[in-house]
Design a protein with these regions (language model features):
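Rhodanese-like catalytic fold shared by cysteine-dependent sulfurtransferases
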Residues: 1-24, 31-62, 68-109
Length: 109
């Protein structure tokens, strides 16, 4: 499993989502983090209770995942991959780097 093939920089992540309106954006942080800031259009699915079989996600849809720094979202990505999902993208650097490189108005924590 090569994590690098699923990693996108914040700019690549944004461009990919912008070009694919059917893609799904998943935030795997906890609710208290979601309440501070989030990327518009995201669905909250905390890693602490993440189960690929009950997410309702379509294996044929491209799924963009993020967390605070990119580690938890990679764990969720690996679970989805094991469950048969193949169109998966992870935000390298997480929402923290996103706030620096894409959305400077976003609160950081």
């Amino acid at each position: 499993f090569d994590e690098a093939e699923f990693e996108l920089s914040p700019r690549e992540f944004k461009d990919g989502m912008d070009q694919d309106p059917s893609a799904v954006l998943v935030d795997v942080r906890e609710t208290y983090e979601w309440d501070i800031c989030r990327i518009d259009g995201a669905q909250l699915m905390p890693l602490s209770s993440f189960d690929p079989t009950t997410t309702g996600l379509d294996p044929e849809t491209t799924i963009y995942l993020y967390c605070y720094k990119g580690k938890r979202s990679m764990l969720a990505l690996k679970e989805l991959k094991r469950a048969g999902f193949n169109k998966l993208k992870n935000l390298s650097g997480g929402i923290d780097l996103w706030a620096e490189e894409v959305d400077s108005d976003m609160p950081q924590y």
